[in-house]
Amino acid sequence: MAPSFADVIAVVPAAGIGSRMQTECPKQYLTIGNQTILEHAVAPLLQHPRISRVIIAISPADTAFARLPLAAHPDIQVVRGGAQRADSVLAGLQAAGDARWALVHDAARPCLSAQDLERLLALTETSQVGGILAAPACDTMKRAEPGKPAIAHTVDRENLWHALTPQLFPLELLRDCLTRALAEGATITDEASALEHCGFHPELVAGRADNIKVTRPEDLALAAFYLTRLTPMETA
């Protein structure tokens, strides 16, 4: 039996400042067209009938979010984010109530397609651990010498994947793994890494490589181009 709609909530950690973008405002509030990156990122989540609520974790010093139309959306809930991504995600999970599944999406990843989201959500019917959207590595990968920009060796890319978001896990499992990983001083670069630290092996769901995260100034134009290439069916 498929899970009920209320079983899935989304958490969007949006408390970061995005220093690599070299802009005065946090990158999630930069605009593409007539919407912020955050609004583009959240739109597919709000439009999907399986997701009952989107919880956005923002910085206590954030003054921009309240001015967005998104702030008045009935399915949006705002919580206070933390110093690290994991802290913000945990704050969102604490506000999630009795939802069974938690889907975590980057605030600066505006090009999520509806098809990728659908494939990821299908894990709720087949997986006990959950998984992530990911794209197989296509480029030749080089490992650098420690502390200097020189090639140490070429890395076999056969089993390498680029981790993307959203990432989807049973809510209690994700909360427990994040809590334990933080307590044990583990490096948590995404939600899956917390599960890995605790001995779990999340599934890889092949996703589109154009589901990019806006991290550097040149990414903004690329994301704008990708958004124009998504059809209404792919974004709705």
Curated annotation (Swiss-Prot):
**Gene3D superfamilies under this entry?**
Spore Coat Polysaccharide Biosynthesis Protein SpsA, Chain A
User: Which CDD domains does UniProt cross-reference here?
Assistant: CDP-ME_synthetase
Q: Which InterPro entries match?
A: IspD, IspD/TarI, IspD/TarI_cytidylyltransf_bact, Nucleotide-diphossugar_trans
Q: Which cysteines are joined by disulfide bonds?
A: none
Q: Which UniProt keywords apply?
A: Isoprene biosynthesis, Nucleotidyltransferase, Transferase
Reactions catalysed: 2-C-methyl-D-erythritol 4-phosphate + CTP + H(+) = 4-CDP-2-C-methyl-D-erythritol + diphosphate
Q: Where is this site: Positions MEP for the nucleophilic attack?
A: R157, K213
Taxonomically, the superkingdom here is: Bacteria
Single Gene Ontology BP term?
isopentenyl diphosphate biosynthetic process, methylerythritol 4-phosphate pathway
Q: Which residue positions hold the site described Transition state stabilizer?
A: R20, K27
Q: Which Gene Ontology MF annotations are present?
A: 2-C-methyl-D-erythritol 4-phosphate cytidylyltransferase activity
**Which pathway does the protein contribute to?**
Isoprenoid biosynthesis; isopentenyl diphosphate biosynthesis via DXP pathway; isopentenyl diphosphate from 1-deoxy-D-xylulose 5-phosphate: step 2/6
| Any Pfam family matching the protein | IspD
> What's the Enzyme Commission number for this chain?
2.7.7.60
Provide the assembly information. Homodimer.
User: HAMAP family under this entry?
Assistant: IspD
Please give the function described in this protein's UniProt entry.
Answer: Catalyzes the formation of 4-diphosphocytidyl-2-C-methyl-D-erythritol from CTP and 2-C-methyl-D-erythritol 4-phosphate (MEP).
Homology family: Belongs to the IspD/TarI cytidylyltransferase family. IspD subfamily.
Full protein name: 2-C-methyl-D-erythritol 4-phosphate cytidylyltransferase
**Which source organism?**
Cronobacter sakazakii (strain ATCC BAA-894) (Enterobacter sakazakii)
Q: Which gene encodes it?
A: ispD
